[in-house]
């Protein structure tokens, strides 16, 4: 990476609800843009229009417009106009929902390529819950906690969202099954792990972000600079 990439945020869930102000204000400021593009892909089977409406109301309260880009199917993800819209955005936000559907829709698609290009050109990219999970490779498989192939915007780490509320047995499995050099990061709801353009990491929110390497708790400084 050449240092021009944008801020990258892994949000632990409960996006666009009271308590997320600190996270989203920081992202709006980093984007320095009047509009956030919301991809409700992971919520395709859970009334994605409601996710967009929630985002619109939430970001309006922060002085920013939100618009939904209905990339819900594999066909949508290959649409060149939708890809162009993603490429032109300065702030992209992947909603929560089904990480497996999100991965299958975006993997190797025109929209995913455009998102990567936008981020490398300085756009802010945020993902919450499912949206956070798929951005890494490997990623946590929500069906049992094992690790599987993710989209790999960053590597060397995997994200467990809803940390502190997720099934403890599944979380334990994710931590213990991880390779010895892989960081498993637990992010609580309404909190975020944020990668800055210089490759450094910070946590935002009222609850601590937890990092595990080799099955043991470590600090944020254990995350590889840049995460790649």
Briefly describe each language-model feature range.
Residues 95, 101-169:
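Class I SAM-dependent methyltransferase SAM-binding "motif I" and its flanking Rossmann-like core
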Residues 34, 66-67, 125, 209:
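Hydrophobic anchor at the start of a short beta-strand
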Residues 5, 33-36, 89, 122:
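A general structural motif
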């Amino acid at each position: 990476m050449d240092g021009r990439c944008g801020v990258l945020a892994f949000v632990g869930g409960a996006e666009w609800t009271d308590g997320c102000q600190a996270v989203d204000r920081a992202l709006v400021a980093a984007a320095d843009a009047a509009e956030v593009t919301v991809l409700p892909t992971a919520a395709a089977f859970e009334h994605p229009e409601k996710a967009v409406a929630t985002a619109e109301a939430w970001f309006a309260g922060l002085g920013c417009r939100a618009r939904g880009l209905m990339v819900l199917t594999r066909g949508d993800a290959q649409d060149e106009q939708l890809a162009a819209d993603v490429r032109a955005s300065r702030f992209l936000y992947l909603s929560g929902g089904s990480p497996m559907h999100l991965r299958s829709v975006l993997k190797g698609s025109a929209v995913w390529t455009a998102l990567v290009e936008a981020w490398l050109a300085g756009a802010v990219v945020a993902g919450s819950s499912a949206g956070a999970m798929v951005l890494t490779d490997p990623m946590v498989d929500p069906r049992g906690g094992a690790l599987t192939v993710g989209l790999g915007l960053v590597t060397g780490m995997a994200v467990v969202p809803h940390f502190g509320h997720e099934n403890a047995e599944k979380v334990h499995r994710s931590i213990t099954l991880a390779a010895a050099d892989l960081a498993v990061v637990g992010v609580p709801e309404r909190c975020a792990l944020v990668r800055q353009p210089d490759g450094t990491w910070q946590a935002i929110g009222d609850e601590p972000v937890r990092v595990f390497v080799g099955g043991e708790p470590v600090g944020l400084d254990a995350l590889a600079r840049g995460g790649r």
